[in-house]
């Protein structure tokens, strides 16, 4: 039992804090403050960035998306601070694992009877923490998809699925070959130097201790879990997409009929 706490106490503490941090619903707070509206009673009823756009416009939707992504990033920063504590209880605190609990908190917030958002903005924060290249690819695919489909749900689901596929491709994930080890810095020093160029926050492990960092496999598994949660949270959207009843988030402008 002592050995368990020796390696995982920092992860447990950061994960608990991350869950409570993730449970903060910025869409509920901001829409109520700015528009005096309960976002859960309008539009899709979902407390997220897209429904905030419906309630307050694109500007506030972007604000909510940014703040939701920050919940995951701040959770990683908390893990970083814990890892700096000069004790074996905290020195190997993962920066990735606690982030998934922030995403779970967003979807199932304790402050709002476990009824939360659909994880897209938090997934963006997760991609930023794990691998900045994943985030860039997601955003490129998302903007193209939303321009074609006019549906945020379609763009979000497709972009997440696309990232879940390409993240296993060498070089796109920052390494030249697959690294399976969690604590593999010594054995793969050259590959790690390439990997942490894309995993910015993970680089702190290397800079501060020079002996340990979260592995590529760990990061990809966390992204996979986040992507699956995102997909499950969009299950109703997927049904409507199949039935061709999913409404456009950004309807196309109707062309005037010339006589």
UniProtKB/Swiss-Prot annotation:
The keyword Nuclease does not apply. Pathway: Lipid metabolism; phospholipid metabolism. Keywords: Cell membrane, Lipid biosynthesis, Lipid metabolism, Membrane, Phospholipid biosynthesis, Phospholipid metabolism, Transferase, Transmembrane, Transmembrane helix. It is found in: Cell membrane. One of its GO terms (biological process) is phospholipid biosynthetic process. Pfam families: G3P_acyltransf. One of its GO terms (molecular function) is acyl-phosphate glycerol-3-phosphate acyltransferase activity. The chain crosses the membrane at residues 11-31, 62-82, 93-112, 124-144, 152-172, 188-208, 211-231. It catalyses: an acyl phosphate + sn-glycerol 3-phosphate = a 1-acyl-sn-glycero-3-phosphate + phosphate. It is a multi-pass membrane protein. Its EC number is 2.3.1.275. Catalyzes the transfer of an acyl group from acyl-phosphate (acyl-PO(4)) to glycerol-3-phosphate (G3P) to form lysophosphatidic acid (LPA). This enzyme utilizes acyl-phosphate as fatty acyl donor, but not acyl-CoA or acyl-ACP. PANTHER family: GLYCEROL-3-PHOSPHATE ACYLTRANSFERASE-RELATED (PTHR30309:SF0), INNER MEMBRANE PROTEIN YGIH (PTHR30309). Belongs to the PlsY family. This is Glycerol-3-phosphate acyltransferase. It comes from Mycoplasma capricolum subsp. capricolum (strain California kid / ATCC 27343 / NCTC 10154).
């Amino acid at each position: 039992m002592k050995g368990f706490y020796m390696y995982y106490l920092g992860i447990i503490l950061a994960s608990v804090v991350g869950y409570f941090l993730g449970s903060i619903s910025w869409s509920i707070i901001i829409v109520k403050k700015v528009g005096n509206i309960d976002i859960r009673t309008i539009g899709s009823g979902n407390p997220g960035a897209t429904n905030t756009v419906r309630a307050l416009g694109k500007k506030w939707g972007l604000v909510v998306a940014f703040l939701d992504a920050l919940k995951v990033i701040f959770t990683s920063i908390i893990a970083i601070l814990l890892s700096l504590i000069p004790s074996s209880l905290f020195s190997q605190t993962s920066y990735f694992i606690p982030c998934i609990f922030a995403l779970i908190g967003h979807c199932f917030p304790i402050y709002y009877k476990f009824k939360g958002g659909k994880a897209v903005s938090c997934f963006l924060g997760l991609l930023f923490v794990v691998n900045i290249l994943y985030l860039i690819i997601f955003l490129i695919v998302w903007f193209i998809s939303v321009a074609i489909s006019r549906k945020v749900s379609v763009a979000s689901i497709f972009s997440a699925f696309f990232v879940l596929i390409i993240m296993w491709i060498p070089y796109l994930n920052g390494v030249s070959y697959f690294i399976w080890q969690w604590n593999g810095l010594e054995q793969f020093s050259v590959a790690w130097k390439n990997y942490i160029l894309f995993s910015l926050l993970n680089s702190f492990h290397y800079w501060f201790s020079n002996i340990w960092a979260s592995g590529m496999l760990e990061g990809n598994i966390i992204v996979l879990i986040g992507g699956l949660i995102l997909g499950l949270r969009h299950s109703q959207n997927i049904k409507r997409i199949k039935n061709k009843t999913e409404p456009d988030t950004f309807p196309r402008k109707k062309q005037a009929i010339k006589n």
